[in-house]
Amino acid sequence: MSSTDWSWGGLFADFDNDGWKDLYITNGIRRDVNNKDFYNENRVFFNKMKNDPNYKNKQEEYKLLSYLEKMPSEKLTNYLFQNQQNQGFENKNIEWGLDEKTFSNGVVYSDLDNDGDLDLVVNNLEDLASIYRNNSVNTNFIGFELEGKNNQTPIGTRVHLKANGQYQMQELNLSRGYLSSVSPRIHFGLGASIQIDEIIVEWSDGTQTKVDNSKVNTYNTIVYNDQSVFLKEPKSKSKLKRFETVAQKEPFTHDENRYNDFNDEVLLPHKNSTLGPALAVGDLNNDKLDDYIAGGAIGQPTSLYIQQKNGIFTKVKVPIFEKNKFYEDLGIQIFDADNDGDQDIYIASGGNEFEEGSEVYEDRFYENKGNLIFERSKTAIPNTPISGLEVSVNDFDKDGDLDLFVGGRLSPKKYPYPASSRILENKSSNGFIKFIDVTDQKLIKLKNIGLVTTSKWVDLDGDTWEDLIVAGEWMSVRFFKNNSGKNFTEVTDQVFKTNYRGWWYDIEKGDFDNDGDVDLILGNLGLNYKYQASKEKPFRVYLNDFDKNSTYDIVLSYKSEDTEYPVRGRQCSSQQMPSIKEKFKNYNSFASASLEEIYSDKILEESLKYEVTSFESIYLENNDGVFSAKKLPYYAQLSNINSIVVRDVDGDGNLDALVGGNLYNSEVETPRNDASYGTWLKGDGKGGFKALLPRESGLVMRGDVRNMKIIKVKEETHLLVAKNNQALQQIKIN
């Protein structure tokens, strides 16, 4: 729906009488004023005219109107999107006979033939108006003609209707559809229903009328009558919301440093320098109260907040954090590395601002010395500079201490070149903390595995040894069996046979169907974005030095029918690869060319290539060690899911999931992902979920949500929500 060309009128109305409003959009522009080729010719024309000393003697040659008539012009079809009943909208303009090509602007709906469905009248520029008769059959409706006080048209009056358990409301407003006025009737589609449960008219003066004896499949007249009008009843007190944002005395605010990734990598799909902040919860001063650490961007120190007995969080200044503020904190784990009874800190450093191999990509380990004194140990962990994000903790070898999986997020300035991930085995002894990189011995496949964003330790086969799951951007979900702590074997093909690649951002586990094993929820980009993908039409990226200038270039592509095309246009593509301007002299020739015609089959075959086959966020149900995928509910697909929290929110014995996300820093030609306010996925205990909207749950998380953690505040359960370049949000769960 985001690409409806030059749109004018937009009408929401129930054209198929199923009780759900559809959307009709007129579009078209007489001259293509945004045509880049004409714009370039235009500059040449006016420069020639400006610099011609004999301009006044060449009026015919420089006749402006004649020149402007050369501006391209193309008639286009309008759009009718059918409401899929809380599952989005589907374009039906061809199927429903509305594929005439026109220059359209004004549009109205009205039941012109009084047969119970809405017809369309469309105004077309320099052409006859179009009248479309609606031939819907086997559906029911009810209509109302409202007569207000003193025989006036009661603009602003609302009609509330309940039928077969479904609620609808419409407000009488005539000015609709771009400089147009629709019929003064109010029209409700009823689908198969023939029984009305309740009709209430809320007049524009605030009074109400309850309507009885109205007839289905006809138009009913309702007249404002002082004798039948009663005042609105006072609203009952709203039910306590499950989620409630609480005020903070000294909230953490993430302060993203200014850096433009697109200066070096013009064709990136999104920034890779804005992936924070990290967030972790733990008791860092051994007072039995949860504290938290929030990661800083470059130039912002890591922030430690200690919980007081009254539930207030106080920021504590840690000198070593101030000293290390020029690292970017993208992953944090709080755990006792040396079994001395206090909590240490591991921080994964990341970002995209510096060259590969820079020391600012070295991870950091801070040993807890007690009394909130932390010291950085450069000998505790390998000083390998990899831009990371994900860290997960597990005693994979059951030797009594905690080991680490550390995910490589990216190779700076070489997107999407794969990064290496690591397994660090804890070899601490006698109070001396030491982690050894055992990736080569335990799981060599982690070398250059991809752009890792998330991991999870799960006992997949019930042998009591926790196995490793890894996922990321442009990756499939990878499953690695723990062979009794000795090493790991990939079992992806055995446990997830319908696996597909995505932009995975988070994995969480839980027994969502109450059958005794562990299921999974995975967050993906979602289905409400410019980029779309399927197995038949994958979304791809290619990496190569396409123009042979000793720098890597990337090309994003999509499939239309059986042909592959570049996502980005001539202008952006030529900024990265200037040779494109020489090969394609104008925008039209580039727009008409396939990917192979632009870059050649040979160089594409030689390129590093990844593809995505689905952007759906999914639930993976465990059936005796084999996972099957189910799409999460529609409202969980409206934006990407960056963070997932699993718990029984309402105490009904079934696990639920709280999901948050958004992606604000997309490339300039792609609107940002910002449709999520967070969603409570209420579990039914059978592997199903119902998405509860903010107005039902009270869960409202505006912004670019990056991380969420549960934290105990006195005797209450709260949710911490960390957002990029925004203040941390604290939400009480009632």
Regions found by a protein language model. Give the residues of each.
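Gly/Ser/Thr/Pro-enriched helix-cap/hinge segments flanking short amphipathic alpha-helices
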Residues: 66-79, 83-278, 487, 527-538, ...
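Beta-propeller blade repeat segments, especially FG-GAP/WD-type strand-to-loop junctions
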Residues: 36-41, 77-90, 129-139, 301-316, ...
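Blade-loop segments of beta-propeller domains
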Residues: 312-335
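Acidic/hydrophobic-patterned starts of short beta strands in beta-sheet-rich repeat architectures
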Residues: 18-26, 114-123, 286-296, 339-348, ...
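Short, conserved, GDST-rich strand-edge loop motifs in beta-rich repeat architectures
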Residues: 29-72, 348-360, 407-419, 523-537, ...
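Asp-box/WD-like beta-propeller blade repeats and closely related beta-sheet repeat scaffolds
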Residues: 325-331, 350-396, 418-419, 436-444
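Beta-propeller blade termini
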Residues: 8-17, 105-112, 275-286, 306, ...
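Solenoidal tandem-repeat scaffolds enriched in leucines and small polar residues
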Residues: 382-428, 432-458, 465-466, 471-473
